[in-house]
Amino acid sequence: MSSRGYPCTPNNIKQVMFPADHCIILPNPRGTAPGCIMEKNGKAAILMPGPPWEMEPMFEEEVVPYLQKRSNCMFHSRTIRIFGKGESQVEYAIKDIVDAQSNPTIAPYAKAAETTLRITARCGSEEEGEKLIQPVMQAIEDRVGEFIYSTHGREMHEVCAELLKASGLKIAVAESCTGGMIASRLISVPGSSEWFMEGAVTYSCDSKMRRLGVKAETLEKYTDVSAETAKEMADGIRLQSGADIGISTTGYAGPTGAPGLIGQVFIAVSTEEGCNAYEVNLKGNRERVRDGAVLNALNLLRKQIIAKNRCNLDINVL
């Protein structure tokens, strides 16, 4: 701490004090409080720091290997991510598979506008776990395969990043109601400079006209929340940036705005072959509407790349 110009307080010293005997210190490169494993009489107590960004890597890098050495078996999991089909619909579609589960087990989770299935096998090795999991995964894919976008737990923006990189396509984004959220998620992926050209937040009608070339007559006739406006936004950002794909969003995120239209969002995807706009109607508060719009836009991007056969990646590696 002194090398960083911080005083070492009594509290900091207390954080690094552990019993002298039967104690394994777990290093914490992300904080000042190490963890420890105390062993006695064939039992172990494991202590880790509370902040998740410190605890989670310590658990994965230090605790899991320790537990694996002490156990004759291990747990191996695969995570399936599903978009476009709700948790209850997914559960109904695979009910007989879930009812028949023993090893591996299936655990469904709902998150925002998507559903996650975690398949976990009790096994002696990772290879054995994969062999147990594969038939269950195949049975699930047979039921809801068209809605699966990842079988390795990758999030939607990570999948889109993999597809963009593999296809060699470049993207630019024009956002209104999502306010830069799509761009933010895409460029959170390392190496995004290879395929992300630019992002523009064009919230006002004036900025849509000035920055993207949206026509005044389009806004007058159809309003700023319309398929027509979304298409001109997507075309504008693609042409001005030189990208292969332009994505746009415009909508009513709420809670104020057009009565009865809160949650209405238009998303457009522009390529040199043409531009298509899609309407989605989302429920929930402002945050949920915006999150849903981002996921829908990324899903349309994912489908666009796959449909053009510009990439040889399939669901089994994503």
Q: Where are each of the predicted segments found?
A:
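Generic secondary-structure signature for well-ordered alpha-helical cores
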Residues: 2-6, 23, 41, 60, ...
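Structural motif
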Residues: 22-24, 43-46, 79, 104-107, ...
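Short acidic-glycine loop/turn motifs at beta-strand connectors
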Residues: 40-42, 112, 123-124, 270-274
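Proline/glycine-rich low-complexity loops and linkers
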Residues: 1-70, 222-224
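Short alpha-helical segments enriched in small residues
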Residues: 128-318
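Accessory alpha-helical/coil subdomains and C-terminal extensions
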Residues: 39-40, 47-113, 118-120, 128-133
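Short beta-strand segments
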Residues: 19, 26, 39, 48-50, ...
